[in-house]
């Protein structure tokens, strides 16, 4: 089977807590004792130095060294030598463009899918782990050469998923309506709406919903379904043609 190991987190910060505070135990369990250093990809934010400082402080507090890819003179070589990869949140379009600009799409895919290097993403970093960034919440502030992403899983994710607020007077589309519009297009893959506080752990061909909140699954042509932490989503990994059912 596929050696991939992924921890796809909806959000970096949960209300009332610090950076990655809500998932730090999951991070330690995921990386374990074999990983000594993590390669951080700060491309989703403009101030990469400040972003790297924040991430380094957190990971060092968990017992891991952190190298930021933007400090490397050869980003491709940094990926090839990495023990684990963490792509942080920010603007998904800016992030994906930088991954293409630095020729990292295929390199990261190979390291994760063939070499089994652990991959962690939060928010935008979770978006780019999927088929495409079509279901991001972000504004297209820059123009990547493609919306196709890393494809580490054969479906899409909507991080920071928000349920409709019955008391709101806002007349714009809800998140659910926007995802339904996406699924009006042919051959669009499943979309997993990850609420803040939720994350998906993928180990080989097994995927499990973790965290403190649930998720909402959208399949093309089907009514969305509600899922609690602990749900086995392995079927999403096995069958990428669920939208045709």
Language model region names:
Residues 79-80:
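A short, aliphatic-rich alpha-helical micro-motif
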Residues 36, 83:
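Conserved acidic residues
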Residues 101-116:
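Catalytic-core regions built around general acid/base machinery
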Residues 8, 66-73, 91:
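An anion-binding catalytic pocket shared by soluble metabolic enzymes
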Residues 1-33, 46-53, 57, 134-135, ...:
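C-terminal and late-domain segments of enzyme folds
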Residues 92-102, 168:
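Glycine/threonine-rich flexible loop motifs
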Residues 37-45:
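Short hydrophobic beta-strand segments
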Residues 86-89, 112-132:
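Catalytic nucleophile loop
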């Amino acid at each position: 089977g596929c050696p991939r190991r992924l921890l796809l987190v909806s959000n970096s910060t949960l209300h009332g807590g610090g950076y990655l505070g809500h998932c730090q135990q999951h991070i330690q369990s995921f990386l374990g004792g074999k990983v000594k250093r993590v390669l951080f990809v700060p491309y989703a934010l403009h101030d990469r130095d400040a972003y790297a400082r924040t991430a380094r402080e957190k990971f060092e507090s968990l017992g891991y060294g952190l190298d930021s890819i933007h400090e490397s003179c050869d980003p491709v070589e940094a990926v090839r030598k990495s023990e684990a990869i963490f792509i942080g949140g920010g603007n998904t379009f800016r992030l994906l463009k930088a991954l293409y600009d630095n020729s990292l799409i295929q390199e990261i895919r190979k390291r994760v899918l063939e070499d089994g290097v652990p991959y962690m993403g939060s928010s935008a970093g979770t978006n780019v782990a999927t088929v495409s960034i079509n279901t991001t919440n972000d504004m297209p502030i820059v123009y990547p050469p493609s919306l196709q992403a890393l494809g580490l899983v054969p479906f899409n994710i909507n991080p920071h998923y928000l349920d409709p607020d019955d008391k709101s007077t806002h007349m714009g589309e809800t998140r659910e309506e926007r995802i339904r519009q996406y699924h009006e297009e042919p051959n669009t893959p499943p979309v997993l709406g990850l609420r803040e506080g939720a994350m998906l752990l993928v180990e080989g061909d097994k995927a499990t919903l973790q965290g403190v909140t649930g998720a909402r699954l959208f399949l093309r042509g089907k009514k969305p379904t509600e899922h609690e932490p602990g749900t086995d989503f392995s079927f999403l990994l096995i069958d990428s043609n669920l939208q045709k059912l």
